[in-house]
Regions:
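Gly/Ala-rich beta-loop-alpha elbow adjacent to hydrolase catalytic centers
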Residues: 165-170, 174
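Alpha/beta hydrolase fold serine-hydrolase catalytic domain that processes acyl esters and thioesters
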Residues: 1-20, 28, 33-40, 44-107, ...
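Short glycine-enriched nucleophile-adjacent loop
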Residues: 174-183
Length: 293
């Protein structure tokens, strides 16, 4: 079964010939898991964008061993792809703050005339996972505040329309940043992508900031989603077929692609429904104070 790597190898059309889509977004949302600190400058340096295909030191990009072979295959496929030949990056930010329970990482991609701001999901640190659990009773968490700050700063330096997105917690950050960015930015944002990203507390969906940007959200989850069904979700969800099982479906490398799009399912798997119902019952029966304990 084909994957995002196959798509990067086989889809040769430019985004002008074949518009940017959910699969493209997931690819960029996967690349943000790489360590760009040795190649891409932070926002404060105001340096030029760097072409992705100029990077040849793969070991420096890979700071952890998870999915190492697949990550290298994706890097090579994107670098060799006519569709992504003009992919550039800038404004890399990577923050780990144990004291304030903050894990945040973002980068800005430019593909031809398109600007895509990608937020990283939870990494394998205790700080990252602790912040995820804090979302059950607290909003905003530090990473959400950083996402708004980052979007506001980057948009000040760049003109034109914006796309924002991320995988896992990165999808949640993309939505939250779009909700609370400057009002003019809300109209500049063309699309918001959440790939198996957790939802929000119920009251968020009733707020005006959410309602303003709700129609721009594209949320995708795998059939046995767990992370993407955490907390409440109001968006219309597109369910993607996966070639793995259980929690391993969360990995973007396992999502099935065919004919330049995801392969979609009509409903989530039984195990996903059970987990979703259990979490919903817990949220309905507890208060923020009790969840914090």
């Amino acid at each position: 079964m084909n994957s995002i790597i196959s798509y990067a190898k086989e889809e040769t059309r430019s985004i002008k010939e074949f518009p940017f889509n959910d699969v493209d977004s997931l690819i960029l949302s996967t690349l943000i898991y790489l360590d760009f600190s040795k190649f891409v400058s932070p926002l404060k340096d105001h340096k030029d964008f760097v072409y992705f295909n100029s990077i040849n030191n793969y070991d420096a990009l890979l700071t952890d061993s998870s999915y190492k072979r697949l990550k290298i295959n994706l890097i090579k496929a994107v670098q060799a792809s006519p569709r992504f030949q003009n992919l550039k990056m800038n404004y890399y930010v990577d923050i780990h703050d144990i004291k304030n329970e903050l894990q945040f990482c973002a980068i800005t991609f430019k593909l031809d005339n398109l600007t895509y701001i990608a937020f990283r999901g939870t990494d394998d640190t205790l700080t990252g996972w602790k912040e995820d659990f804090n979302m059950a009773y607290k909003c905003p968490v530090p990473a959400q505040k950083e996402a708004v700050k980052y979007l506001n700063q980057v948009s000040y330096h760049l003109g034109g329309y914006l796309y924002v997105g991320g995988h896992s917690k990165g999808g949640n950050l993309a939505i939250y940043s779009a909700m609370h960015t400057h009002i003019l930015n809300k109209f500049r944002i063309k699309k918001i992508y959440s790939h198996d990203g957790p939802g929000f507390k119920k009251e968020i969906y009733e707020s005006i900031p959410y309602r303003i940007i709700a129609s721009k959200i594209s949320k995708t989850i795998p059939t046995s989603s767990i992370i993407g069904l955490l907390l409440y979700t109001r968006e219309q969800i597109k369910i993607v077929k996966s070639r793995s099982f259980g929690i391993f479906q969360h990995s973007s490398f396992n999502w099935v692609v065919k004919n330049s799009d995801f392969v979609y399912e009509e409903t989530t798997a039984k195990d996903s429904k059970i987990i979703d119902n259990t979490i919903s019952d817990w949220l309905n029966e507890t208060t923020d104070e009790s969840r914090a304990l």
